[in-house]
């Protein structure tokens, strides 16, 4: 969706945000209403759908894969997550064909950077490393179904939702012939008259309370904004993609990624201000997510989420 | 495991001639002229229609409007993860099939020198993806108010030991099972799309085609109800 607004409208918008009032009544540090639903796709290991302000709509699905790698080739353990953002043509006809690929790759790359130290950040992510040379690969795929600004923000919320929904099978690793290992799914016997392959596999979940998130902070006029609407995105001077992760040890926030997006000029001091705004916003978001993940009712698998 | 059990049921508990539940929602995409979310059981499809708008010079036709379709599947839609959501041979083929089918449904002469974009996204694929896309597209076009000869409906049918089974799931879409996807207008004898996969004995062809035609008529009944209900719900907005 391309937005065309006149110079006078832009002026109105810019002078508004400089006085901390946006066109939809929010202040500069406010997010739009967030809708977060988990467990929406039965065909995935974990899924989540996030809507921002009823118009930006992102769907995240995680597929696990048992990956073998060469431990000698990696100096230090590589983090097991890989991200892929796809802009569906449904969101806007400008994304048809290869139209959304460039922006999608840009966001995917930023997520890859923001999550590059996730083995240190997420407390139990190292459990995905099963044995020397084997690990669970976590493929996080995002599909942007509707677009109305702030796609990276919606994506990072969907990633956190999907990671918290993700169930990883417990496995038993036993040494095998020729220095290899055999990996078998763990099925704890609870009694009852069942065949071995009918016993459900034990699962474990990731601890996502410190999961990194990627926020966009935009400079409009002299003000810094989060969660921009499409009209506001027309007026952006410069935009930063800032990765923030909660530090569980000192109760503060770490910056995991800073990327300037879409050109423009920035002063050094502005970058400082913008990262501060990002970590402040992240604090609110972490609280809201934690509350939502606790209170969300468990849906039955395969319910219709877009109805 | 056999596809039809000895008691005459399929793996998901359906009878051979029974379709899965169809759930729909129209008009959920605010940016598009028309949109539809459709479920055939676990197959979930999202379709958006943009246009008609003035087409680019490369696609412009002087006497009618150009139909541009794009079929893509999310990378997590199938059993195995895919690397690319679109652009592979199968997606391109399905896009072209949809394009040709809807060129003969839409009254293209009403919009010379314009273009209509149809975008289908399979969010979760559990068999009969092409049929689900045709059904979703028909409803999205109806939602966009684009004049058509009628509502198109489609179904995928297979044949197991001379018995036809309809609305296949991905577990039933095996390499050996012959399957036909048929689309008709208003459940009548007007075929707009037919596609056969795998090898089928010629004696079985009429059996499968009859089953497919009957299923298309069944699906049409469902789609017509949805379209009418949506129109009723919109009546206060339209002012009558």
Swiss-Prot record, chain B:
Q: Where in the cell is it found?
A: Cytoplasm; Nucleus, Nucleolus; Nucleus; Nucleus, Nucleoplasm
- Top-level taxon in the UniProt lineage: Eukaryota
Q: Which SUPFAM superfamilies match?
A: Ribonuclease PH domain 2-like (SSF55666), Ribosomal protein S5 domain 2-like (SSF54211)
Query: Keywords assigned by UniProt?
Result: Cytoplasm, Exosome, Nucleus, RNA-binding, rRNA processing
- Molecular functions per Gene Ontology: RNA binding
| Major localization class | cytoplasm
Q: Which GO terms describe its biological process?
A: nuclear mRNA surveillance; poly(A)-dependent snoRNA 3'-end processing; rRNA catabolic process; rRNA processing; U4 snRNA 3'-end processing
Q: Is Transferase included in the keywords of this UniProt record?
A: no
Instruction: Please name the Pfam families in this protein's record.
Output: RNase_PH, RNase_PH_C
Homology family: Belongs to the RNase PH family.
Q: Identify this protein by name.
A: Putative exosome complex component RRP41
Protein source organism: Caenorhabditis briggsae
